Amino acid sequence: MRGLNLFQLILALLLSMVAAEDGYDGWLRYAPVSCDLRCRQALPSHVVLLNSTKGSPIETAGRELKAGFQSILSTNLTSRPFQCNSSTSILVATLDEYRQRCRDINVPELDPDGFWLQSEGDTVRILGKDARGALYGAYEYLAMVAQRNFSRVAYATSPHAPIRWVNQWDNMDGSIERGYGGASIFFKDGTVVEDMAPVEQYARLLASIRINAIVVNNVNANATLLLPENMKGLGRIADACRPYGVQIGISLNFASPEDLGGLNTYDPLDPGVIAWWQNITDSLYTYVPDMAGYLVKADSEGQPGPDTYNRTLSQGANLFARALQPYGGVLMYRAFVYDDNLNESDWKADRAKAAVEYFKDLDGQFEENVVIQIKYGPIDFQVREPTSPLFANLYHTNTAIELEVSQEYLGQQCHLVYLPPLWKTVLDFDLRVDHKPSMVRDIISGQRFNRTLGGWAAVVNVGTNRTWLGSHLAMSNLYAYGRLAWSPTDESEQILEDWTRLTFGQNHHVINTISDMSMTSWPAYENYTGNLGIQTLTDILYTHYGPNPATQDNNGWGQWTRADHDSVGMDRTIRNGTGYTGQYPEEVARVYESLESTPDDLVLWFHHVPWTHRLHSGVTVIQHFYNAHYAGAEAAHGFVRQWESLEGLIDRERYEAMRSRLVYQAGHSIVWRDAINNFYYNMTGIPDVAGRVGHHPWRIEAESMRLDGYQTYTVSPFEAASNTTAIITTSNSTTGTARTSIKAPSGVYDIGVNYYDLYGGQSKWTLSVGDKVVGQWLGDMEHNSLGHTPSIYLDGHSATRITFHGVGIRQGDQLKIVGEANGVEPAPLDYIVLLPPGLVD
């Protein structure tokens, strides 16, 4: 019998290692941990809930604790009636209820949503300032148990700020703007979906990281959300979220009184408009009595706003704030207001100055329930930006920071980029307002300027993909956002390690590997995309995904690099530039005003310098570009090798899904590297001192091969092709063949093929060496859940690579690729590369 039990234990452990998982449970897997009979006997065996009403967060806490103990420890927690002496039990209650029923207890002062957790072996007490806080405490304790942490603890914790929201940019048709994880879980075909199971699971995940509200629809809002049938649907969403303490809010279209209400104006001072919005708000609160509030994007990127009627932004915001006040609702008003038709020939023009110019003079004119939602940088979620100076210019107005979990400019979940180290460059930044410590994190909490409201918002954009965001590793960013919103001084790496244990288990090699990959990922992505503060050199006019540095300039969007043959960068100084540095407090402005004191990683944000300018590192700007792009691509290839070392330590489904993305990222990093380096080499004529840029001895350009049914094609932008040229089939319904005789010495090689995977077709390619087929593949990224914004062109978005490893070749063998066109995709090819195994070209 003892032998059988041991066998069953070993079998259970093995099954827990290899059982397929799809990511739907996120970090709430409640995976089994080793805990023998003696271990389990030292833990609670009962759960006691005080004042648990149906659907309340405290009832949810009890349900989660039971499910967690059963899954993690195979222990069946039984419910026990409340008693003050709760030995061998987990007691969950609000602090006030506990004090009314039992003796007073020495617990530090708690803020709303805070909790006290005391764990003494088989007796655990979780006391929340409110029911939501009690639920947070239950999740905290379960996270300890799930990480096999059974230590004795007694501590109180309260949130950094009262507002800890997430934003979804979901559209009424079910699409998601800047969403890369599938369709909306909230909307479809103009109405609210029937199935609330994914909504409930999302709320569960959010509650476990202490997020207290979600704005369910796009800031580019559709007024039809305010139709009665959709208000009723919002009520169902709120009902699904309420047991987890998650409130819902909605984004509003400023012109709704005219577009939906039949009025001939949406002037925020018009009595009819004011009455219309009050009536809408009253109606919404009948369906959602605990609605968190509204989010408004106005006078920005074509969205209507108060400026149409020559009204101020504060007058526009206060219209909604006053309608919400009887219900305790909050109005989040985005500071993302700027002119998208700037004149680049004006040396003083600067989009980065817009937020301060629009909002500073309105400080103190907003209602007390208005919170200005400020992006972390002054442009738009770039790979690196300086801290928005608006945080230092609103003394008498509530503020919140806006982050983006959805990787709009940062690889769209197809590239691994762990974001907290980026976020912390802003959160930990000291703005030195009035020469006093002024960390951004202390400004948004309200502490610095004695504000009672403020906090956090993050654009998340989960979808129907079972991984939520499209990528298993991208979920670390959502988890970390919640952790930082509660406690912004937590270390990025510690958060990551906790997430990894909860998501992938206790294996030290797994934890160390994922931690190393993730902590390296943001610097690597910055290296192969945009350096020295120049911003992410992506296509800002199209997908925001692949490389296209020319799109930054010669348009009115204001994300300019001002790059030319001789020099690069925006002069934002007071002395000779746009004056942007003057928007910062004196101590910070002084640092950025001087080229000598500006850190290298922001030098091109603040200064216009020659390409030959030497950085503090001693390297010229152009050589830094070349070096960084090669280093970044090298690091991306390293991620694949690191991940492959985890084979067998992670379940097959998640291992393979993540491996395919990392392989794709490695190939796309080469596309990025070459595009940026070639673009600026072509612009400057300054060679790479290491001789790498434009020199690829391992490559065979497709246009140099013998072509039958293929023709050459000039790619635009030129840098999106290795030699500015690709090949495509002569028509979209034909087959093309490209052949060449291999000149490389006989041996074993990795063969990479760079091609273009266009939206709207699934071409088929077959690669042969000699008389043997090496491999076949389809151009099916749009059907293979990759999820990034697709392209219908041969460009840096559609460019990708497939690699076949360990192929034996003989000098003189014929290498042949047959491409079969499909749809709009003409089986396009860029080049073939023969590499000694392990070499990055």
UniProtKB/Swiss-Prot annotation:
Main location class: secreted
Question: What enzyme category does the UniProt record give?
Answer: hydrolase
One GO biological-process annotation of the entry reads: xylan catabolic process
The stretch of residues making up the signal peptide is: 1-20
Q: Report if keyword Signal is assigned.
A: yes
UniProt-annotated glycosylation sites, renumbered to this chain: 51, 76, 85, 149, 222, 279, 310, 343, 450, 465, 527, 576, 682, 723, 732
Function statement: Alpha-glucuronidase involved in the hydrolysis of xylan, a major structural heterogeneous polysaccharide found in plant biomass representing the second most abundant polysaccharide in the biosphere, after cellulose. Releases 4-O-methylglucuronic acid from xylan.
Which PANTHER family does this chain map to? ALPHA-GLUCURONIDASE A
Q: Which family does it belong to?
A: Belongs to the glycosyl hydrolase 67 family.
Q: What's the protein called, per UniProt?
A: Probable alpha-glucuronidase A
Its gene is aguA
